[in-house]
Amino acid sequence: MIRVTLACAAVLALVACSPASETPEPKTETAAASTAALPAAPVFTLVDSDGVQRSLADFRGKTVVIEWTNEGCPYVQKHYSAGAMQALQREATADGVIWLTIISSAPGTQGFVEGEAARAFKAKHDGAWTHLLLDPTGQVGKLYDAKTTPNMRIIDPEGRLVYVGGIDDRPTNKVEDLQGANNFVRAALTDLEAGRPVATPFAQPYGCSIKYPETVEAEA
């Protein structure tokens, strides 16, 4: 199984931040050329909150945002209670972006939902994602090396991973810290829409640990 680890973050950072030579040649590089080395996003299939199978492959040709969430996590609550996450979801989807929100909490752990609770999740949180995907085994979360909630990935229309990490630069659970925060996801989507390489392709994630079965056992 392929795993998207911090090595991918290193590749992303290298593409965005390669040092210039002391005597630089004239720049003729296109955005397409500068993204050629970006890692491919692993394809996966999960069942959504309505019981329908959704594959990442279905959205090839679209920009895709992946968000890991856990409604019991104070760091997630910070973004949802203020409506900030939902506002970003609406902005993105209005521009044609596919937004996949994933719950990787194991059964019996904080954030796990199924059945009617999963079907009611969007209305409960005023969510504006495209699909809510359920990952109770944690297989997809671990495939993407997601360790915290919230945790974000952005995939470009060619299926390349162009952003990995935290949603912003304020690693707190305080709503007031949203004011003036640098939202890396919004900035990355703006770069993509403008045809530019993503200026900040990796940011340190923060939040609650994702409740994989082995994570819960280790914390017990």
Feature locations, PLM:
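Bacterial N-terminal signal peptides that target proteins for export
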Residues: 1-6
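Bacterial signal peptide processing site
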Residues: 17-21
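N-terminal "domain-start" segment that seeds a small globular fold
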Residues: 24-56
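Short active-site neighborhood of thiol/selenol oxidoreductases, capturing the structured segment around
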Residues: 57-77, 99, 189
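Structural microenvironment flanking redox-active thiols in thiol-disulfide oxidoreductases
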Residues: 77-125, 136-142
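Short, internal strand/loop/helix patches
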Residues: 119-156, 161-162
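Thiol-/selenol-based redox modules, centered on thioredoxin-like
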Residues: 154-220
